[in-house]
């Protein structure tokens, strides 16, 4: 070529390696874009919950509304910022980072939507904890963190990315603190 580079011609008959059908289905995700990658729904719900949670807390704290909380308003606010907002943010980060660390496909579609629903169920359970009882609320709330931890461990181990198993320490601390 004129620029001193060699021209490389590829054969038009090159065929990509066969992709197992299960991976091809997951790679060609055609569902809602919101559930294509973990950061999308979890960063969204974290942002929304941080605003809604603060508004509810301020109104509850000043007696403008009465939420059926099984704890005082300040404890509820602290709990929701840690186990609602922070947990959703960590979930969004991990579900986006782990595929990059492991080379595996991201958790998406109905499995990701299921995790989001577990997170939402935890928020509702804590919000209604005076009605459903503290034990039931705690059980529902911690189920999200347990599910997230199991997904994270499964993906990290399947990808043989042992050095990133240390992120599990953060999830274990959150789980233990939430029990």
Residue ranges and their predicted role:
Residues 2-179:
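Hydrophobic alpha-helical transmembrane segments of multi-pass integral membrane proteins
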